[in-house]
Amino acid sequence: MAATVNLELDPIFLKALGFLHSKSKDSAEKLKALLDESLARGIDSSYRPSQKDVEPPKISSTKNISIKQEPKISSSLPSGNNNGKVLTTEKVKKEAEKRPADKMKSDITEGVDIPKKPRLEKPETQSSPITVQSSKDLPMADLSSFEETSADDFAMEMGLACVVCRQMMVASGNQLVECQECHNLYHRDCHKPQVTDKEANDPRLVWYCARCTRQMKRMAQKTQKPPQKPAPAVVSVTPAVKDPLVKKPETKLKQETTFLAFKRTEVKTSTVISGNSSSASVSSSVTSGLTGWAAFAAKTSSAGPSTAKLSSTTQNNTGKPATSSANQKPVGLTGLATSSKGGIGSKIGSNNSTTPTVPLKPPPPLTLGKTGLSRSVSCDNVSKVGLPSPSSLVPGSSSQLSGNGNSGTSGPSGSTTSKTTSESSSSPSASLKGPTSQESQLNAMKRLQMVKKKAAQKKLKK
């Protein structure tokens, strides 16, 4: 280590350091002149034999190395002279690393560089100091180039240099731009499509190099192509798309059932208009309601006429004389529609001042039935809303008809007159009540059976 300390105090090295630290403009030229002088001394053969020791050539070789590296550093000094101290510290470190390397090289080059010696020094005698000197000169040049390349490789590994030119120099219009995908650095001029000012200076803009943009375009095209490839898969899915078509008949069936329900009510109205009793089955589609109304109608028809119910219905209808006509119209119409032939005859009798011979004629019921058809069809909605009529009997309907005629004039008096007219009209139609009640019971039973059958069919369909 003492030898290395003595080597650092070499006058040529100190002179080179002085030129390196100096801020004068001529320092670079003086340093170059010193380099040339040291190189001339190194080549001079008369100077080499005079030095018996091997160490002085080592010193000269280290000087050569140091001076070779100094011009590079000094070339950057005019741009920034303040960096001289930092560079000298790096220089000293490099020198300290080189000296042990020189000793190793002197041992290695004796075996490695012997074939090179005859080519370089044919006229000279191969004395040991010359061989050591020449071997040291050659590896030093190689070492310097190796260190330069290693520094460049280090900069490349760290990602600090341009990928194209492998340099870290940055000019005003030639900055290093980083690709956001591969994170490689490019000079703006080195990149083949030159980077514009907008791309380089806009911090919001993400810049990609040409290679990465090509790769990204390929990836984008690949990602767009796969949806086109499974087009046959979409065709294979079409059976699944056909499933809704299979399901559509079910929806159609549901629509048909709802539509049939409407048809069913229309059919029921037609049967009711044809002369069957208990219009409750027309108004309500629920089977429980139908059975209740039909049973109630059968019981009341077998029990006979009840004037109290008739009076209650007429009183309810005549409670408000202004609205009673509107409320009683559907009652009278449904009564017309649901009454049997005997009932129609009794209505005619009550309207025609109780003549017993008229109810036996068939034409009047036909005409009345037609009028009932037209009126009941026009007032279906009203009869569905109102419906005190289902509980009315055959004589009740006739009494309500007569009450309709009288209720427009007076409320309670109309009800009393309707009672009297119903009593008077019941006497001529008494002979016809028996068969009409039986017919109504039979019709109610038939309807119940039909409703039960239809309900069972619905359940089976579901």
Curated annotation (Swiss-Prot):
The UniProt regions of compositional bias labelled Low complexity, in chain numbering, are 347-358, 382-437
Mind naming one GO cellular-component term on file for this protein?
Answer: nucleoplasm
The record's account of how the chain is modified after translation:
Dephosphorylated at Ser-128 by the PNUTS-PP1 complex, promoting RNA polymerase II transcription pause-release.
For the cross-link Glycyl lysine isopeptide (Lys-Gly) (interchain with G-Cter in SUMO2), the position is 68, 254
- Pfam families reported for this sequence: PHD (PF00628)
Q: Which residues carry this modification: Phosphoserine?
A: 128
What's the main place this protein lives?
nucleus
Report if keyword Nucleus is assigned.
Answer: yes
Superkingdom as given in the UniProt entry: Eukaryota
The molecular function GO annotations come to:
zinc ion binding
Bias (Polar residues) occurs at 59-86, 301-328
- Any Gene Ontology biological process: RNA polymerase II transcription initiation surveillance
Localization in the cell: Nucleus
Write out the biased-composition intervals (Basic residues): 449-462
Q: Where are the zinc fingers (PHD-type)?
A: 159-215
Q: Which UniProt keywords apply?
A: Isopeptide bond, Metal-binding, Nucleus, Phosphoprotein, Ubl conjugation, Zinc, Zinc-finger
User: What is the role of the protein in this entry?
Assistant: Component of the integrator complex, a multiprotein complex that terminates RNA polymerase II (Pol II) transcription in the promoter-proximal region of genes.
Protein name as it appears in the record: Integrator complex subunit 12
